Each structure stands twice: as structure tokens, then as C-alpha cells.
Amino acid sequence: MKRLVIIDNEDSFIYNIAHKIKEVNSFISIEIIKQEEATSSQIEQFDYIILSPGPGLPNESIGMMNLISEFYTKKKILGVCLGHQAINVFFGGRLKKMPKICHGQKTQIFTSSETYFATLYNSWCIDEDYLPDCLEVTARDNSDNIMAIRHKSLPIFGVQFHPESIASDCHKIIFEPFISL
């Protein structure tokens, strides 16, 4: 059985993430571990890591950044909102304040092959001028802000939006391919 851990960065939506993943694959085992309590030996047991949303900025979540450092070549990783930003920062990228703060705002997300709606709860996004060479953009919003990334050679992905939100219609588009790896 595949095992997935959600690293809880003090976000109230982590149980929504677990629920939406179970909708996509009811056979996957899911555990939630608080970021500050996660140990290497615990995380080593899992096939997949989801870095949850949360308050603050990536460099304020030292535990999460350490987990990325330790497991980025060993595990499949998906970052949501803060987790997405952390992946970017870990690989040398920078963030910028969004021109307009978005909290609970439904927006269109555009990929090369489809369009869907997702919900934003953030005031920061990836600064494209400092996007690391190892990452590529896979989705944008109406304002051309980066909304999704993937690593060019490792199974690492990030989404700025919240696919687990009730107002988002994209949880299957995001979670199904990730847990199929």
C-alpha cells in the first residue's frame, strides 16, 4: 500500500487535503504530522510528502525546509501554497508580494492543455525573474502569476492555489497524477 504524509504547517485545511486525496485513491494510507514534530525516521517510511499550506514565509518554517533538503532526491513531493513557495525558495528562487492579496478568491488557472478554477489564500507568489533553472512553470492565473511548478528531473511539484478548497474544481487534476507516480 502506498503511504503519504501531509506535513502540517499549522493550516486548518490539512484534513480537506487528506479527504480529497482519499476521494482520488481510497487505498492510500495517509498520516498527518506537524512540521515541528516530524523526524527523519518517520518521514522515511512514506512514499509521498505533501507540504501543506500555512501562515508565514518558507524560511520561517525551518523544519519544512530541512525536510525538503533531506528528502528532495528520495521522495515524491507536492507543495501546496506555502509548500509550493518553499520548494521554489529551497532551489534558490525568490518570492514577491502579489499585486492584490487573495483570500478565498476563486480564480482561473491555465495550463498548456486545460483551464480550471481554484481558490487562492495568499499574498505571495513566485518571482519569475528569480525562478530556478531546475523548475518549470506548469500553470498561471489571469494575471500571469505562476500558479504551478514542477522540477525538471525530480518528482517534485507545487501549486500556489488550494486544490482542496470547496470552491476549487481541480483536486483530481492535481492529486491523481501525483499519487499515480
Question: Model segments located where?
Answer:
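Histidine-centered divalent metal-coordination motifs
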Residues: 81, 122, 162
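Cysteine-nucleophile active-site neighborhood
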Residues: 46-115
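Catalytic beta-strand/loop cores that center a nucleophilic Ser/Cys/Thr
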Residues: 113-154
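A short beta-strand-loop structural module common to alpha/beta enzyme folds
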Residues: 28-37
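Acyltransferase
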Residues: 166-181
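Short amphipathic alpha-helix with an adjacent loop that forms part of the alpha/beta core around
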Residues: 37-46
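A generic "structured core" feature
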Residues: 9-12, 19, 23, 32, ...
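Extreme N-terminal starter segment of soluble prokaryotic enzymes
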Residues: 1-5
